[in-house]
A protein has these predicted regions:
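A conserved hydrophobic position in a structured secondary element of the catalytic/binding core
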Residues: 2
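Extracytoplasmic/periplasmic substrate-recognition and gating elements
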Residues: 124-152
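Extracytoplasmic/periplasmic solute-binding protein
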Residues: 8, 22-70
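Paired acidic/hydrophobic, glycine-rich loop segments that form the ligand-binding mouth/hinge
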Residues: 107-112, 117-119
Length: 152
């Protein structure tokens, strides 16, 4: 998900659907900052982007097709884990939550389809309240032309 309101406030264009890790990291780095001068980071680039999203974005999986071997020692998996850690470190140890996203203080958040449905009104669910406009987009890929989707 992309918080359109936050990007507009920061004069940042909404990324294209074929964005990459480099673009994603650069935007998150720009957006993660102390906005009120109290020394505490209160605006964030991303919430809830973890190793699972990074593995999918890098086109790799945790186990071999037959399920007999763990593949974490492969270079693509290692690269994905390193990227997830790099993204996590941007928040400088701040413990983010869904509430932080709902308050409009986070620019990007990967979501499962079931989570998406709680933000979009439909007959069996009440729309979750938010004070910002948002849009959906594929997660950034490790490299150009490799659109990623959220696992799950």
């Amino acid at each position: 998900f992309i918080n359109k309101t936050l990007l507009q406030k920061e004069h940042i264009r909404i990324p294209d659907n074929d964005w990459t890790w480099d673009e994603f990291y650069s935007l998150c780095e720009q957006l993660t900052r102390d906005t009120d001068g109290d020394g505490i980071i209160d605006q964030f680039g991303v919430y809830d982007y973890g190793w699972e999203e990074a593995l999918v974005a890098n086109g790799c999986s945790l186990f071999s097709e037959d399920g007999q071997h763990c593949l974490l020692n492969q270079s693509a998996q290692e690269s994905a884990m390193q990227f997830a850690r790099k993204i996590y470190q941007l928040n400088a140890g701040t413990d983010l939550s869904e509430k932080t996203f709902d308050e409009g203080r986070v620019a990007f958040r990967p979501m499962l389809f079931s989570e998406y449905r709680s933000y979009e009104p439909y007959p069996w669910r009440i729309k979750r309240s938010s004070n910002f406009e948002w849009t959906a987009s594929p997660c950034p890929a490790a490299q150009a032309s490799a659109a990623a989707t959220t696992p799950g």
